[in-house]
Amino acid sequence: EQPYKLKLAESAAAIPKLHTDAYMLSLTTVGLWVPKERTMWAVKGYPFWFTSAVLAHEHAHAWQQENCPPQSQDLLEGFAAWVEWRVVQNLGYASFAENMYRLPCPIYGRGLRRCLQLEQQVGAQGLLHKVKTMRNFSKWTSFWAMLDEM
């Protein structure tokens, strides 16, 4: 396979717009994974720790593309947010990680919280295994409801 490419954009406007949804566009202005080009984008000018977290998020999408069946948006973004959250935590930015955890967005914030709940149940390796085998949450009747019952 071709290696991944990293492109740094001068501004959010220079990152390719792959989404037509305005909400998604607002969330993808600091980083983006472009599967067909095997390219990760990040906007220049942010602190190292933040750029590291953004690239970890995008790298999670690359990993999902190569190791997982096609997945629903909430699973894709929830898992990538979990990877990003772990990087932020490991770099010592607990207050930023807490803000990520509290994000009300049903795809990113709730997805992160559900992945953290699953990690508590099965560990990080167990979470990776589950993500590798899941297609989408709708096939689980409601994956979120299942986790709420745990």
Regions found by a protein language model. Give the residues of each.
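Active-site recognition of the HExxH zinc-binding catalytic motif
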Residues: A53-E66, E77, A81
